Design a protein with these regions (language model features):
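Short, solvent-exposed S/T- and G/P-enriched segments that are highly enriched in secreted/extracellular
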Residues: 95, 99-101, 106, 146-159
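A short, amphipathic beta-strand motif
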Residues: 116-126
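Short, ordered, surface-exposed loop/turn motifs in non-cytosolic proteins
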Residues: 124-145, 164-166
């Protein structure tokens, strides 16, 4: 990115996060895994100002924070998330979506879009299925794309605060599968 002077939003946002962190500015990459309204995705950067995350584009020059071409698109996103490597117990990270392989995923959606809490429940023979996995998918480019994977608690439930829209959900538990 540095030598070539160009890159996609993912490369440029990773570059900007690294540059900001190298001079002591707390920064993170924020990402929409798939837009609900078109066949694409987007990544940008948030910086910590006091105790509040503010955003800027990775490659879109704007004269102030919290402005970017993607604001309207993000207001329709089902999921805007960030990730950290580690446990991530601080409330500054946002609402925990899940952990996998040393990576913790957090929802940043409420800062960008209207949201609601979705509850997913897995039952097997009428009893809770703890540990069931829910793959949350959106229809994009004529196929379903996974935007998050949740794991059920001891009551067989998982929750996530997501944007408003339609989801396709695949659930699996001990060789049993269901979809809705």
């Amino acid at each position: 990115v540095y030598r070539g002077g160009r890159g996609r939003c993912g490369e440029e946002s990773a570059f900007l996060v690294s540059a900001l962190r190298s001079v002591g500015i707390p920064a993170r990459q924020v990402y929409v895994p798939r837009w609900s309204h078109c066949g694409d995705n987007h990544a940008w950067v948030e910086v910590l100002c006091g105790d509040e995350w503010r955003f800027l584009g990775a490659c879109e020059p704007e004269p102030e924070l919290d402005r970017g071409w993607f604001v309207t698109a993000a207001s329709r996103a089902m999921l805007v998330h960030s990730r950290i490597f580690g446990q991530g117990g601080s409330p500054l990270h946002g609402e925990l979506l899940g952990r996998e392989g040393g990576v913790a995923w957090f929802s940043q959606t409420p800062r960008y879009a209207r949201t609601r809490v979705y509850t997913f429940r897995a039952l097997a023979n009428g009893k809770p299925a703890p540990g069931a996995r829910f793959r949350l998918q959106i229809l994009n480019e004529s196929s379903f794309h996974t935007i998050a994977v949740l794991t059920a608690n001891d009551q067989g439930e998982a929750q996530a605060r997501l944007g408003l829209g339609s989801l396709h959900v695949l659930a699996d538990w001990q060789g049993l599968f269901a979809e809705a």
